[in-house]
Design a protein with these regions (language model features):
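Short, positively charged low-complexity motifs
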Residues: 24, 28, 35-37, 42
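N-terminal Rossmann-like or analogous alpha/beta NTP/dinucleotide-binding catalytic cores
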Residues: 62-192, 347, 351
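Conserved nucleotide- and phosphate/pyrophosphate-binding catalytic cores
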Residues: 78, 210, 216-391
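Internal, conserved structured core segments that host functional sites
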Residues: 170-226, 247
Length: 391
C-alpha cells in the first residue's frame, strides 16, 4: 500500500476510500482540500495512486479568486490588465474566476442585456485562454452561498466605513440619482466573493485595493466576533510584473466599458471597427521641439503601442516623435494593424465558441458545481460558528 493511500485525508461514509489509517494531511492543509469524492470516481481512487496525488496536489494549492463585472464585452484593458495573468495563474494555483452579474445589478440592466452580457463574458473568458479544466469558471448568481455570506457580513459592516469608500464617493458624484444600497455595500459583496472560497490571493487593480483591505477587515471582524480564526487574510496578487494599465482612446484615462464605444477596443471587434476607432483617437498638432514631453492623449497611443506592437515598431515611432517627424496618421494605422493582429486569435475563438451553446452550458454548469462545492463548505461552517444549528 502506497504512502498516499495510508495518508488518505478522509475516512467517512461518503468517500470511496475507507480505512483506519487516516493521516494528518487534512489537518495540515485544512479546509482548502476539496472532497475527493467529487473530484474522481471510486474506480480512479482505487486504481491509480497518481490520480490521488494529483488531487492532493491541487488541494494544496493556494486559492485565487477574481472576477469581472458583466456590464458589456471585454476589452484590451481587461485582457492585458487582468485576464492575461489569469491564464498564467491557472497553472499554479487553485483559481476561481467568476462573472460578476450580481455586482452589475447596481446599474439596473434589462433582463435581456444581463443574460447577454453574462454569456459574452463567459465566451471571452474561454476565448482568452482560461481553461475550465484548470480553473473554476462560474457565474456569481449561480452560487447562492455568496449572497448568504454577503448578508452575514453586512451585519457587521458599518455605515461610516462604507460611506468612506472611494469608489462609492466617486459613483455618487458621477450619478447622484442612482445612489442605491447595492453601491454602498459593494465592498461587502466583494468580500463575500473572496471569503466564500477562503482565498488568500486576489488579483486586483489599484482602484480595488481599498475594497480588498475592507474584505480583510470584514473577515477579521467576523473572526474576532466569534472568537474563531476562520477566514484567512486575502492579499493583492498579480502573479508577475507584467500587469499593465491600458489607456483609453479618448485620452482621458484608462480603457473602460462605461466610457463610451470609442474609448475601448473590444476583444471581439472586427478589423474594420478597430481601424475606425483608432483613427478617431484624439491627437494634437504634433511636436514642435525635439524630445518634448508627450501630452496625455499622445502618450496613451504610445502606451498602447508598447503593449501590442514590437519593440522595433515602438522605437521607430518614438524616434520620429522625438525628432518632430511623426505623422499621426501613420502611427494610428500601424497601431490599428498591430491591434488587429494581437486580437485575431481571440476573435477567432470567440466566434467559434459562441456557436457552441451546448459547450457553454456545460462549462457554466460544471463551474457552478465546483464553486458551490467550495462555497457550501464555507457556509456550513459559518452557520455553525454563528449559531444556526439543528435541534
Amino acid at each position: 500500500m502506497c504512502a498516499l493511500w495510508r495518508s488518505c485525508i478522509y475516512n467517512c461514509r461518503d468517500c470511496a476510500i475507507k480505512g483506519k489509517e487516516t493521516g494528518n494531511i487534512r489537518r495540515r492543509l485544512g479546509p482548502q482540500i476539496p472532497h475527493i469524492k467529487s473530484c474522481a470516481p471510486s474506480s480512479i481512487l482505487f486504481s491509480s495512486c497518481s490520480k490521488i496525488e494529483k488531487i492532493l496536489t491541487f488541494a494544496a494549492m493556494e486559492i485565487v479568486v477574481s472576477g469581472i463585472r458583466s456590464t458589456g464585452n471585454l476589452h484590451l484593458g481587461n485582457y492585458y490588465g487582468a485576464i492575461q495573468n489569469f491564464v498564467k495563474m491557472q497553472h499554479e494555483y487553485n483559481c476561481f474566476f467568476f462573472i460578476a452579474d450580481l455586482h452589475s445589478l447596481t446599474t439596473h440592466p434589462t433582463p435581456a442585456s444581463l443574460h447577454t452580457n453574462v454569456k459574452s463574458v463567459l465566451i471571452e473568458y474561454l476565448a482568452a485562454g482560461i481553461d475550465p479544466e484548470k480553473a473554476t469558471i462560474y457565474v456569481q448568481s449561480d452560487v447562492p452561498e455568496i449572497a448568504e455570506l454577503y448578508l452575514y457580513l453586512n451585519m457587521n459592516a458599518y455605515l461610516g466605513e462604507l460611506e468612506r469608500s472611494t469608489s462609492f464617493k466617486d459613483k455618487v458624484r458621477a450619478n447622484p440619482e442612482n445612489v442605491n444600497a447595492g453601491l454602498l455595500t459593494y465592498p461587502v459583496l466583494m468580500a463575500a466573493d473572496i471569503l466564500i472560497h477562503k482565498a488568500t490571493k486576489v488579483p486586483v487593480g489599484k482602484d480595488q485595493e481599498q475594497h480588498l483591505e475592507m474584505a480583510r477587515t470584514f473577515g477579521n471582524r467576523f473572526n474576532r466576533l466569534y472568537n474563531n480564526e476562520y477566514f484567512p487574510e486575502p492579499y493583492a496578487f498579480n502573479f508577475s510584473n507584467s500587469l499593465v494599465k491600458i489607456p483609453g482612446l479618448d485620452g482621458k484615462g484608462k480603457m473602460g466599458k462605461s466610457e463610451g464605444e470609442g474609448n475601448a477596443i473590444f476583444l471581439g471587434d472586427a478589423p474594420e471597427v478597430i481601424r475606425k476607432k483608432v483613427m478617431r483617437a484624439v491627437t494634437d498638432s504634433g511636436p514642435t521641439v525635439e524630445n518634448q514631453q508627450k501630452p496625455d492623449e499622445i502618450q496613451n497611443l504610445f502606451d498602447l503601442m508598447k503593449v501590442v506592437s514590437t519593440q522595433d515598431t515602438y522605437d521607430h515611432f518614438n524616434n520620429l516623435y522625438n525628432t518632430c517627424q511623426v505623422r499621426y496618421g501613420d502611427l494610428k494605422k500601424q497601431l490599428a494593424e498591430d491591434m488587429i493582429i494581437a486580437t485575431a486569435p481571440i476573435r477567432d475563438r470567440i466566434n467559434a465558441i459562441a456557436a457552441d451553446t451546448s459547450y457553454l452550458s456545460k462549462v457554466a454548469k460544471m463551474g457552478a458545481e465546483k464553486a458551490r462545492e467550495s462555497a457550501s463548505r464555507t457556509i456550513k461552517d459559518v452557520r455553525e460558528i454563528i449559531g444556526f444549528r439543528s435541534f
